[in-house]
Amino acid sequence: MSYLRFDKTLMTNLEDSLPKEVLRSNRSGAYSCSTIVDCNTRKYHGLLVVPVPELDQENHVLLSSLDATVIQHGAEFNLGLHKYSGDNFSPRGHKYIREFDSLKVPTTIYRVGGVVLKKEQMFQHFEDRIIIRYT
């Protein structure tokens, strides 16, 4: 099995990073899907998308995204990235990404000032749950 790892050069270039997606699914049909820079560019993207048979036969986005903000010495650094009409992006959190690795657990490494932050997204296989851990 092969795993993907991308460095800062690719991650900060949106033309290269936005077409690359990560998809994790579980046994109940739930999934988590987005681009490698966590920018939802498609209708089916979301951190937690689950089928709700009580409503209909469709998947429903329960959690679209989660944007972290690092506050260091009174300054705010938004790590999120959203695309709006006309190819406008805000905030531009991808500029803090240093590395993305999909080895077992999708992991993104950020560097904000003198702080290095690791984000891991663990998708549960037997429950409709996503766990996001920052260290």
Residue ranges, per PLM feature:
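Terminal accessory carbohydrate-recognition/targeting modules of carbohydrate-active enzymes
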Residues: 1-135
